[in-house]
Amino acid sequence: MKIKNQQSPARGDIKTRLFNMKRILYTLAIALSILACSDEIDKSNRYTFTGETMADFLLNRSEKYSHMITLLKRAELFSLLNTYGQFTLFLPDNEAVEKYIQEQDSIYSTTKDTEAPIYTGITSPFVEELSDSMANVIARMHLIEKNYHTAEFGEGAIGKWNFNDRTLVVSYKVVDERFYIMLNNSAAIIDSDNEVENGIVHVIDKVIDPEYKTVANKISEFRFFSLFHSAIAETGFSNAVSEKFCRDSESFKEELQNYWKLNPNRYIKFTAFVEPDKVFNENGIYSLDDLKAFAEKWYGTEAKGNYKDPKNALYKFVAYHFVEGEIPYNRIVLSKSGTGPDFDKYYVAGHDLYNYYPTMQGTLMKAMRPLSTTDGRNIYLNYSKRALPYNIEMRRHINVRVIELTEFTQMDEKYTDFMPNAGNGLIHPIDKILIYNENEMVGNIINERMRFDFASLQPELSSNNLWQNTYGEFPAEYFKGIKKMGGNGLIMYIPGAGYLLDNIWLYVDFDFSFKLPPVPPRTYEIRISQQAHNHINTGRTMASYQLYLDNKICGNPLLQEPHSDDLDIGWIEDNVTYDNGVELDKQMRNRGWMKAPDSYNDYYGGFVNARQSFSYLRKIIAREYLSDGEHWLRFRYLGAPTVEGYRLFILPIDYIEIVPLHIVSDPVKPEDRH
């Protein structure tokens, strides 16, 4: 079948309809979770259970799916589908497979950028004559090693990669009053949730294309991105985002203890935020020359005419649109579809959700879902709640909305076939021209307490589908933003708890430096998260460690998990104080400590608010002027006693706060508790 859009509705209609779609999906998800937790399951309300394995499902319908059987066998995956496990198969029928093969250009696929042709492996229109490599790729594009019912989908990426190490992006379409779930805005699910012994089968109407073009070259495919593509071509920026993977993880095997599975390749991926031509046109920009003049207005004329120089205005303009790491829409900031059913228990309603990303310009971008406003369903870049920006000319360039794929494909007929997936990342359309202006950032957008999740600052995690998803254990060399200074320490990534639902653990005799994000030059108070205990709940003696900022010692050594009720910290529950903890906050600050934020709840503590939990603190480590250039925070293990033969040396680190000094000391508007 062929899915087409109906006539494009107004934005308000689109948003309302999408909201209703998602509400139905979330209601189904809740119902499923209730059934799963019940001791007595009403079988009449379950999905039809066939008693077949996934392999049986295919063989029993071989007249429709023989091509996929052939492809799965050639990829040496078919026997896997006869085993115990959890799999999701997106299943195109024979007609869809044949059509896909016939639609491929030739043996070679080229791009508009005249890059080296890509071998497709397709030498004839017959499935049996596909190359081994192409058969393998097609089969792997359609299989995921986890069960996914459609009720678990939300706008954005499916949590786990497919067997081809690619993200599948979910969106929606309505055709003739029928609702369709789309994969990569290409394949529609036409028969969903066929449950088998070892997984779920969703029948789709097309083969999911194994896209290999880079992000930059994928942008060039869409005429409605022609101006931004011209800027990429002029600056040669495609070279900066051309990597697909770097050092093979096989070379790390001697250094890893292999407690948890590590992705066999260390991919390098990128995310691009791109304006359609219509957005440029609305700002009087119709040509590349117009865009060059616009860039020089905001970024100056240094290296004028040398467009491949990183100091050139056009180069800076392009670079600010890219961040390292593959960041799906539903993980730009945390969302229920990106994190799972515990989201509503974990985050306190009404608090804004945000994250900060270092861009390839070497500056910051802030992403935010303003849940404290009536506009909390959207994600914005460089969001401001001020009625007017710090610089009045910036009014067109702040509160830049990232447009969901479903909405974007229905905004204009030209956008109908837009696919966000590239071979090395993702593309997100935006609704305003995105620029970096330091005066606006310092005076408005990031004139605030900035809280950076240590894990989200490591793009290797999102590039390899580990971020908020998979346990992993690594040497420091896996990350370019972490340096090993000495010792034999390892780094463990732990999803599921913490400020942004994850933590990094340092263990053994660790000595690591973490690169700090590129904040504007000014004086800051710097704090880190600190896990703790109290005397009632533990008698353990903990390891100690020393912090250094740019090789300068930060105060006295710290315990791995100090006792929060010690006199030198002084934590007490707010509800036993006469003023709900106001004076206590001042006393703790004088001792160099703060309670945890009140905007999220403690996952391990039964979802008690983090501020009311003795297990979470913030340690004030320095007040320093951070100049332009790199800055590094070092964690150095000092030693641990042996308790019953076990050395205690795990240090969980969650986030770092970098706070402009005037925010800390403002007597008129004290810093909030969020």
Predicted regions and their residues:
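Sec-dependent bacterial lipoprotein signal peptides
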Residues: 1-35
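Bacterial Sec-dependent N-terminal signal peptides
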Residues: 27, 33-62, 78, 107, ...
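Extracytoplasmic/secreted envelope proteins and their assembly/folding machinery
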Residues: 55, 65, 69-72, 94-98, ...
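FKBP-type peptidyl-prolyl cis-trans isomerase
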Residues: 90-100, 195-210, 273-282, 421-436
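Aromatic/histidine-rich interaction motifs
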Residues: 102, 107-187, 292-413
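Extended compositionally biased segments used for macromolecular assembly or nucleic-acid engagement
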Residues: 240-256
